[in-house]
């Protein structure tokens, strides 16, 4: 049940945030703002997501997942509810940028990693990588679900009302999460699986459950840089994908479906990563995933000269299957090396690489 909960929360976390790609064109059409101005919204969203990581992780360590998940959904609902009244760039910078970025972190993998690691210690440790991979797959499922839903809402009632509806869904989600049986969810029933300071002591001598000590290890910075560099590359492309496909000649519906299909494929790519890494080694799988990402980006670039559906499919498939596939490997490694009471703060600090890389990548996408 813990993995299902974390999957659903990731579905809301990433899926709601990626709806920006669908809102971009109608907001641009009504407001007349430049693409760079609009890209700044998503850049702030990613920046807030990254900078909030260490704070959210600290909160998870101190007050637990229930409060963080509930508060995050409430903040997300507030951001979208206020965004429907936006008339100036700073309104969106604050709401769907800063507030939504913090909320996305609160209900995303930082909280999920701490919660899942509590349940997959000791005799269950071998199941940690698959559990994290399934949880990560919620991100792709969220894109697959919320992109077409948002497009239908915008086509039916307009982008402002669409933000309002999504805000209500998020508020309702906060109530549901608060009412869940957290006494059973927060701690494993087997005392041998408790996350005391002993939890991470046995398997990795290089690890530490203290953030200050973790920052002095090469493992922390290696994982941080994997997340950072990957995010720069991915977010050079992702926020502008729908607008780009429309600009080269595809219809808005086709572009949205392509982006949704891209999210659909990430579900399988991410879910399979943990198993493949266990069978063939993390290094081989990560290398293969980067090769697929590069192939997908090159394929998207060729659409400027040859905007045909076959080439679009050939670009979306490798890009979708590889996007996010590095995340489960990083999370599982961090959970093993830094298991303990300080895992939330450590993993939150590590995921600052995603936010900062995403912010830089998004800003560059608007400039270019």
What does each model-identified segment do?
Residues 96-137, 333, 339:
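Cytoplasmic helix-loop-helix junction between adjacent transmembrane helices
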Residues 18-25, 147, 212-275, 361:
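Extracytoplasmic gate region of multi-pass secondary transporters
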Residues 11, 79, 91-107, 228, ...:
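Hydrophobic core of transmembrane alpha-helices in multi-pass small-molecule transporters
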Residues 66-69, 92, 286:
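Primarily marks hydrophobic transmembrane alpha-helices of the MFS/SLC 12-helix fold
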Residues 52-65, 269-282:
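Helix-to-loop junctions at the C-terminal end of transmembrane segments
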Residues 74-87, 292-305:
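C-terminal ends and interior cores of transmembrane alpha-helices
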Residues 134-186:
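Helix-loop-helix hairpin linking two adjacent transmembrane segments in secondary transporters
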Residues 335-368:
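A late C-terminal transmembrane helix in Major Facilitator Superfamily
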């Amino acid at each position: 049940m813990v993995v299902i909960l974390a999957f659903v929360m990731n579905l809301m976390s990433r899926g709601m945030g990626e709806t920006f790609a669908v809102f971009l064109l109608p907001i641009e059409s009504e407001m007349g703002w430049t693409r760079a101005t609009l890209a700044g919204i998503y850049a702030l969203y990613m920046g807030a997501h990254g900078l909030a990581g260490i704070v959210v992780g600290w909160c998870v360590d101190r007050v637990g997942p229930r409060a963080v998940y509930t508060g995050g959904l409430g903040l997300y609902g507030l951001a979208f509810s206020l965004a429907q009244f936006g008339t100036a760039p700073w309104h969106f910078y604050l709401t769907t940028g800063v507030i939504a970025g913090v909320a996305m972190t609160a209900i995303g993998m930082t909280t999920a990693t701490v919660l899942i690691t509590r349940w997959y210690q000791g005799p269950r440790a071998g199941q940690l990588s698959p559990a994290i991979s399934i949880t990560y797959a919620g991100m792709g499922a969220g894109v697959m679900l919320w992109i077409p839903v948002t497009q239908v809402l915008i086509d039916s009632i307009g982008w402002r009302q669409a933000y309002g509806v999504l805000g209500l869904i998020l508020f309702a989600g906060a109530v549901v999460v608060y009412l869940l049986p957290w006494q059973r969810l927060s701690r494993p029933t087997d005392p041998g699986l408790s996350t005391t300071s002993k939890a991470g002591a046995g398997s990795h001598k290089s690890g530490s459950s203290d953030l200050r000590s973790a920052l002095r290890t090469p493992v922390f910075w290696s994982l941080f840089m994997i997340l950072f560099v990957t995010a720069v590359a991915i977010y050079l492309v992702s926020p502008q994908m729908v607008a780009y496909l429309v600009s080269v000649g595809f219809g808005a519906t086709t572009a949205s479906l392509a982006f949704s299909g891209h999210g659909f494929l990430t579900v399988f790519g991410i879910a399979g990563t943990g198993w493949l890494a266990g069978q063939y080694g993390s290094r081989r799988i990560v290398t293969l995933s980067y090769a697929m990402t590069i192939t997908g980006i090159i394929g998207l670039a060729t659409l400027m000269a040859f905007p045909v559906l076959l080439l679009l499919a050939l670009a979306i498939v490798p890009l979708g299957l590889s996007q996010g596939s590095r995340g489960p490997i990083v999370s599982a490694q961090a959970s093993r090396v830094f298991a303990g009471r300080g895992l939330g703060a450590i993993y939150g600090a590590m995921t600052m690489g995603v936010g900062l890389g995403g912010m830089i990548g998004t800003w560059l996408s608007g400039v270019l």
